[in-house]
Amino acid sequence: MRLTILLIIIGLIGYIINSGPLGRTNIIKLFISIEIMLLGVTLLIILSGYNNDDILGLIIGIIVLIITGIESAIGLTILVNYYKIKGSLPTNI
């Protein structure tokens, strides 16, 4: 339980630091921070399903991990292709 809260907080802090007036916006770091937060929430779903002996929580957690992997691959592919075409990544979001 502590690990999941720690992952969510680390992702949130990373998102806040890498966006807005606190730092230069880096879209890759924002993407990674969002993925860390989603991993924390998914781990929380899996652990709650395991603690309650509920198979549905485990199944939903696995489905979320699969969808997250697909979403990460598509997002990174779009960013790489954008970088190849434009020569730089957007810093204004």
UniProtKB/Swiss-Prot annotation:
InterPro entries, alphabetized: NADH_UbQ_OxRdtase_chain4L/K, NUOK/Mnh_C1-like
Record-annotated membrane-spanning stretches: 3-23, 27-47, 55-75
Topological type in the membrane: Multi-pass membrane protein
Single GO term (MF): NADH dehydrogenase (ubiquinone) activity
Predominant location: mitochondrion
CC annotations in GO: mitochondrial membrane; NADH dehydrogenase complex
GO biological process: one example: ATP synthesis coupled electron transport
Enzyme class: translocase
Keywords: Electron transport, Membrane, Mitochondrion, NAD, Respiratory chain, Translocase, Transmembrane, Transmembrane helix, Transport, Ubiquinone
Documented EC number(s): 7.1.1.2
Subcellular location: Mitochondrion membrane
UniProt cross-references to Pfam families, sorted A to Z: Oxidored_q2
Coiled-coil annotated residue ranges, if any: none
Reaction equation(s) it catalyzes: a ubiquinone + NADH + 5 H(+)(in) = a ubiquinol + NAD(+) + 4 H(+)(out)
Family the UniProt entry places it in: Belongs to the complex I subunit 4L family.
Primary role: Core subunit of the mitochondrial membrane respiratory chain NADH dehydrogenase (Complex I) that is believed to belong to the minimal assembly required for catalysis. Complex I functions in the transfer of electrons from NADH to the respiratory chain. The immediate electron acceptor for the enzyme is believed to be ubiquinone.
UniProt protein name: NADH-ubiquinone oxidoreductase chain 4L
The gene coding this protein: ND4L
